[in-house]
Regions:
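Alpha/beta catalytic cores of nucleotide-metabolism and tRNA/nucleoside-modifying enzymes
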Residues: 36-40, 48-49, 74-89, 537-562, ...
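Flanking helices and flexible, charged tails adjoining ferredoxin-like Fe-S electron-transfer domains
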Residues: 42, 175-211, 250, 254-276, ...
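Beta1-alpha1 glycine-rich phosphate/pyrophosphate-binding loop at the start
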Residues: 63-90, 119-130, 140-142, 169, ...
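Iron-sulfur cluster-binding cysteine motifs and their immediate structural context
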Residues: 106-131, 150-184, 275, 832, ...
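FAD-site-proximal beta/loop scaffold in flavoenzymes
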Residues: 325-363, 448-522
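A conserved FAD-binding loop/helix module that cradles the flavin
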Residues: 378, 514-538
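Alpha/beta enzyme core
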Residues: 593-596, 671-818, 826-842, 919
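C-terminal helical cap(s) of enzyme catalytic domains, especially alpha/beta-barrels
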Residues: 614-629, 770-789, 833-834, 845-871
Length: 1022
């Protein structure tokens, strides 16, 4: 039974069934309406500032106590890491990623790409992330680096891409490229979409059936196999000596840096191309190189890595060599290679692994000798295996570290001790033959060379007591006969570094650690490089021609097969994307370039009669928001095309000859003069335009001449001009509508009555750019620095254009719609389609970045969203298009590969969401919601509290730092300003109220108040 609402003065009382009275927390005092109530003042508003920059006084000891008690930095003493193999650094959140991606400059000829071993198009994938196009980003990454997920986790970017980043010298430093890469591929992984071979690679010659052997299933081998599989080779076999693939990523690098699930997913992606992996097959044990040749394998890739530990005996002193031989008998001595393999087998469960072994049991003080990545992996693992103290001792100084920053800094944060300039002399043993200490000599710089890299022992002897020792002096090739035939030195194989081909055998190629490759990403590139030259070797052997310039196929899935063709005004298009009549279509060469990129149509820059020819002022294009912000919104006072009408006619003939299947749309403007419109139509009659757009909406410059917007704000004029034009031509006519007229549907109706087949919604909105505080424009015209109201475009225009698209689609369904206005991302594009548009005109996005990158993002995003929307499994798991559910990485949802159901065509989704846009009076009032704050996600910043207190209903209580704000449901009206102002995605969500809700009127309204608004909404019951 609903609670009864009683009115007593201005207070609202709830009387429940048990007669217990509840008073509203924020009830008004009729005698002090301009003051907060006592409870609001004392419990809510007490934390709100009223004076700023007022000096304060606080004892230093109080500050010190606070800083110690609430330290949120990543430092620790290592002890809490015991037994925990969780990721060191949590996966970057989507919100963090979008902010970081926005910080990227998207440099042309990007230095980061040149610094990337696999030459990933970093600019493009970061732009895709900026637009939340996860598939586009992942496709871009995986096209060049098939192991993009584990490389994102392990890439030493401080030595590669980030080292060359153009913002590396700034306060925030280089872009976190590896973190962005990992997130994009991880989200794609959760989509569960299979890699397939590009279906265009069919009817290949029999040479593509040549047997190919790949030895080892590590990063270089998996990369090589992937590209061979993508090229179309059907008979690729990997022979792996252990029971799972992935190489050191799966078997040695610790779980906290490289989770096994990600590495095995990458192995599975290789198998999806038809590559066969044979486990527990070792070269030298189960087969020989001669065996492979005799079995018909035409080419072999060797990616076995360095399988044996460097004992440290060769080249060392006699004392150290003898002590190493003795140490190998001690149970507390470990080679790093064996140590990490044992840890990996015990901790990283998965794949075809059958027998699990115990991890090494450590305690006390562990000393690690060496300072490479492997040594630090051992040191950090030691903490997790029970060590109370870990020391890394190394021969040189910190400036000569072999380890990269990405692993050294986390090791330092974990409390590992570092002893530099320590050259090991020998191990010391106790009576039981166990190592009890390591004896060192100070190995100091000699200062007699320019680089200060020469060191010498100084006979300053010291010992470091220990309970365990891990010796990490690197690894070497196995001492086997086949290795000796390929060696160029005592440690590495001899190859042509341009092709990865061995000098001993023309049919053999090698990559990875065995040839001295320094890191995981370089190993992937070795395999990638070898794949092309293996392909070249095989094809030329079979008499086939191979291009001199490598042409490697990229990453491909079912998403790339999604049909995004459309039809508008009876004209078919392969995709809905085209360039608007704007600066990007200033000339025909620019339009031709857009066609080469993939845009399916272009609207030429607006042409006028010669008598109306214009001359532009300079400068005339500017940023509408603060120029310091990289927001995709522009303003302009550019007029119509300065080129002659004849240029646009003659050029149309030439471009349609070269691009007969592309759609070319003319754009015309004239005054409200029938003869002018008849003349201009007759002058373009020989131009092979597929459609003609009438520009009745240019908001500046032409308006003063009685053209553009001057003709487009009166439905009668729109109808007249349209009818004059349609009476002279059979070409479909489009009317470009102004956003300045309140009811776009009335203008669209008039255009349709005049014979138009479509409307473009919309042109730009006139506005002024912010000047400097002294009133001078940022980029004014002439000596006077004058400015004029100009057309505002991009993101700032989109809300208005989208609303007009909805209105026209609902009220004038008989007319087709070209959407135009802030279409920056694929998300925007699909929203316009859902709201009734059939084709999408692009401008600001291309002004902000190159047309090719923009098209790639738009196309892949639209395809991915359409695919994901049709995938019922993804929808069931909470995906919104390709946008993953909140905290997807913790949901443990299966990533089993599953095809989408039939993906609808674009014309099937046009207008599909119009019913979601409703007048307010028709919206449900039966569910009143209140915010719910997630304690796990809340940063305790108080932003929601501030917004609610000064711009809401004083319904959030906040007791200061280190406290999660508390929602006062009795006073909450469900406005959701807290959600809008929260800086953390999904930290606050709206849920149905648990209490009844009655609107607080302050003073009860008179009897004129509609009774339907004097209601109490009960709690919603699901």
């Amino acid at each position: 039974m609903l609670a009864k609402v009683l009115r007593k003065g201005s207070n609202v009382l709830f009387k429940s069934n048990n007669t217990k009275t509840l008073r509203m927390f924020g009830a008004c005092n009729i005698n002090s309406l301009h003051k907060f109530g006592e409870e609001i003042e004392s419990k809510v508003m007490n934390m709100m500032q009223t004076q700023i920059s007022k000096p304060t006084l606080r004892p230093t000891k109080e500050r010190e106590a606070y800083s110690d008690a609430h330290d949120k930095t990543p430092h620790c003493n290592g002890c809490h890491k015991c037994g925990s193999w969780e990721r060191d650094i949590p996966l970057m959140t989507i919100q963090e990623a979008v902010r970081e991606a926005n910080r990227c400059l998207k440099c042309n000829d990007a230095p980061c790409q040149k610094g990337c071993s696999t030459s990933i198009d970093i600019k493009t994938f970061i732009y895709c992330i900026q637009n939340k196009n996860w598939y586009g980003a992942a496709k871009c990454i995986l096209s060049d680096n098939p192991l993009g997920l584990t490389c994102g986790q392990l890439c030493p970017i401080s030595e590669l891409c980030a080292r060359n980043c153009n913002v590396s010298h700034t306060e925030q430093g280089a872009i976190k490229i590896n973190r962005l890469q990992e997130l994009a591929v991880r989200i794609f992984k959760e989509m569960g979409v299979k890699q397939i071979r590009d279906p265009n690679r069919k009817n290949l010659p029999n040479s593509y059936k040549a047997p190919i052997a790949i030895i080892g299933a590590g990063p270089a081998s998996l990369s090589c196999a992937t590209f061979l599989g993508r090229m179309g080779y059907e008979n690729v076999h990997i022979f792996e000596k252990v029971s799972r693939g992935g190489g050191i990523t799966s078997n040695e690098i610790p779980q906290n840096r490289a989770p096994i699930e990600e590495a095995l997913w990458e192995v599975e992606m290789v198998e999806q191309l038809g590559v066969k992996i044979h486990y527990n097959k070792a070269l030298g044990r189960d087969f020989s190189l001669e065996d492979l040749k005799s079995q018909g394998f035409e080419s072999v890739f060797l990616g076995i890595g360095l399988s044996d530990p460097n004992t440290g005996i060769k080249g060392s002193s006699k004392e150290f060599a003898l002590s190493v031989e003795r140490a190998r008998q001690a149970s507390n001595f470990h080679y790093s290679k064996h140590f990490l393999t044992q840890v990996g087998s015990a901790i990283k469960k998965g794949g075809n692994q059958q027998q699990l072994i115990d991890a090494p049991k450590l305690d006390g003080h562990v000393v690690v000798l060496g300072i490479g990545d492997t040594a630090l992996d051992c040191a950090r693992s030691a903490f997790r295996l029970g060590a109370k103290r870990v020391t890394v001792a190394f021969r040189r100084g910190f400036q000569d570290l072999r380890a990269n920053d990405e692993i050294f800094e986390p090791a330092r944060y974990e409390g590992i001790n570092f002893v530099a300039y320590a050259s090991p002399l020998e191990y010391e043993f106790d009576s039981n033959g166990q190592i009890k200490a390591v004896k060192f000599d100070k190995n100091l710089p000699q200062n007699n060379d320019n680089d200060n890299l020469k060191y010498k022992n100084t006979n300053q002897i010291f010992s470091l007591p220990c309970d365990h020792v891990v010796q990490s002096f690197g690894c070497v090739l196995p001492d086997e006969q086949w290795v000796k035939k390929l060696k160029k030195s005592d440690t590495l194989l001899d190859i042509n570094t341009d092709t990865q081909q061995t000098k001993a055998y023309e049919w053999m190629f090698v990559g990875g650690d065995a040839v001295g490759t320094k890191n995981l990403v370089d190993a992937v590139n070795d395999g990638k490089t070898a794949s092309w030259y293996m392909h070249k070797y095989i094809q030329e052997k079979h008499g086939q021609k191979v291009p001199e310039t490598p042409e490697l196929p990229g990453f491909y899935t079912e998403i790339d097969d999604v049909d995004i063709s459309t039809e508008i005004c009876g004209v078919k298009m392969e995709n809905p994307f085209g360039l608007a009549s704007a600066p990007p279509t200033t000339s025909y060469p620019m339009i031709a370039r857009s066609f080469d990129i993939g845009y399916d149509f272009a609207v030429v820059k607006t042409a006028v009669l010669d008598k109306d020819t214009v001359f532009n002022v300079s400068p005339r294009i500017f940023k509408v928001p603060d120029p310091l912000r990289q927001e995709c919104s522009y303003g302009n006072i550019e007029l119509v095309s300065e080129k002659s009408l004849k240029y646009w006619v003659e050029g149309a003939k030439q471009i349609k000859k070269d691009y007969p299947n592309k759609v070319l749309i003319g754009s015309l403007m004239a005054a409200y003069n029938k003869q002018d419109w008849i003349d201009i139509i007759h002058q373009v009659k020989d131009a092979p335009f597929d459609m003609i757009e009438l520009n009745l909406s240019c908001p500046h410059g032409m308006n003063e001449k009685g053209m553009g917007r001057a003709c487009g704000e009166d439905p009668d004029i729109v109808r007249d001009i349209t009818s004059w034009v349609t009476s002279q031509t059979k070409i479909p006519i489009i009317v470009k509508i102004t956003p300045n007229y309140g009811q776009a549907e009335i203008l669209a109706k008039a255009a349709h009555e005049g014979g138009a087949k479509a409307v473009t919604l919309t042109n730009t909105m006139p506005g002024l750019v912010d000047p400097y505080p002294d009133g001078e424009s940022f980029n004014g015209v002439g000596i006077e620095k004058n400015i004029a109201p100009g057309g505002s475009t991009g993101s700032i225009l989109r809300p208005f254009a989208m609303r007009k698209c909805v209105d026209v689609a609902k009220f004038v369904p008989e007319i087709d719609i070209f959407a135009s206005g802030g279409i920056i991302s694929g998300d925007h594009g699909i929203n316009y389609l859902h709201y009734g548009a059939k084709a999408l005109q692009i401008c600001s996005a291309v002004q902000n970045l190159d047309a090719a990158t923009v098209f790639y993002d738009l196309k892949t995003s639209l395809q991915a969203n359409m695919y994901a929307n049709a995938n019922q499994k993804l929808k069931k798991n909470g995906w919104k298009g390709q946008y993953p559910p909140y905290q997807f990485e913790k949901l443990k949802t299966t990533t089993a590969f599953e095809s989408a159901q039939k993906v609808p065509k674009i014309l099937e989704i046009v207008g599909a969401k119009l019913a979601k846009v409703s007048p307010i009076e028709k919206m449900s009032k039966q569910i009143i919601q209140v915010p719910e704050i997630s304690k796990d996600s809340c940063l305790e910043c108080g932003r929601c509290y501030v917004a609610c207190s000064d711009s809401g209903y004083q319904a959030i209580q906040f007791d200061g730092y280190n406290n999660v704000p508390r929602i006062i449901e009795e006073d909450c009206t469900g406005c959701a300003i807290c959600v809008a102002s929260c800086p953390v995605e999904n930290a606050i969500k709206m849920v149905p109220r648990k209490l009844p809700y009655t609107a607080s009127r302050g003073i009860p309204p008179s009897s004129d108040c509609p009774p339907e608004n004097l209601i109490t909404i009960p709690p919603y019951k699901f």
